[in-house]
Structure formats: C-alpha cells, structure tokens
Design a protein with these regions (language model features):
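Metal-ion/cofactor- or nucleotide/acyl-coenzyme-handling active-site neighborhoods
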Residues: 1-161
Length: 161
C-alpha cells in the first residue's frame, strides 16, 4: 500500500500536471478499474478522481473528508453519513487548540475541492452518502442533506459488490 499511495501522492501535489503525468494516470486508471480518474487534455483542466479500493491509495483533494469517504466506500459501508462536512471555513477545526488555531484554507481551495465531489457523484453510482450539515458548500444534489432524526430510520440496502 505504501508504494501505491506514493503513486497517488503526485495526484495531490499539482492537479494540472504535465503530459507525462497525465499519461501515467490514464494508464493507471486503465490498469486498475477501481481507480477512477478524469484526465483532462487541456492545460487548464484539473485531474479529479476517486479510488474505490483503498489498497491502491486514495485521491486527495485538499480535504480529509474526501479521503475518509473513499476509505468508507472501500470498506463497503452501506451508508456513509458525513457530520461537519460544511467546507465553508466558518467553523474552527475540531482539533484546534484555543490559543493557537490553524487558519482554514477551505475558501481558497474550494474551487479545487468541489470538482472531486462532483466527480464522485457522477461516477460512483452505488455510493449511498449523506451530509448532516445544513450549511454547506457542497450542493445537496451532490451529497444529499439528512436530518439527524433520519439516521435511525430503517432503510433497505442492497449489497455492494
């Protein structure tokens, strides 16, 4: 896993990349069907992706939430419920220390982050994901809103294969 995660680390470093990087990711996504990557051929286009198998690594997009979603999907959770997925930068981080809070870069990086979530919604048909945040930068057609009271409601799942 360490070797493969290093391969995907270059995915995070710079989403644009050169021709060789784009060819490399195109080949990787053809070899590994669980690694979904959109490789743009324009210079302005950004790489976006989603890895269905965490053993291959994960596609990073400037937020730990996207990595967590890929891990949950890879572990075949039938339903993924995100709490605190607002991406607005208006709240402090849950791990901040009162005297030394880390500045949030979400506002600056949002244009890089949202295409990954959109790509996930358009390409991962069997993902059953919800957002508990009623104030979020992620549109509800990408990750639907769920009230906390709805969590305990019974639901029928089909087995993810």
């Amino acid at each position: 896993i360490l070797q493969n995660c290093l391969v995907l680390r270059s995915f995070y470093r710079r989403e644009k990349g050169g021709l060789i990087k784009k060819i490399k990711f195109n080949i990787l996504s053809r070899i590994h069907k669980e690694l979904l990557i959109s490789v743009p051929f324009s210079k302005k286009g950004r790489l976006v992706g989603f890895c269905k198998d965490i053993n291959l690594g994960y596609c990073s997009c400037h937020t730990v939430a996207f990595a967590a979603i890929q891990i949950a999907y890879s572990l075949k959770y039938a339903r993924i419920i995100c709490s605190g997925l607002d991406l607005t930068g208006s709240c402090s981080r849950f791990y901040d220390e009162d005297k030394n809070p880390m500045p949030s870069e979400l506002t600056r990086d949002l244009f890089k982050i949202l295409p990954f979530f959109r790509f996930m919604r358009e390409n991962i048909e069997d993902i059953n994901i919800y957002n508990l945040s009623d104030d979020t930068a992620i549109q509800y057609d990408i990750i639907p809103y769920m009230k906390i009271s709805e969590i305990e409601e019974p639901c029928v799942y089909e087995k993810i294969s």
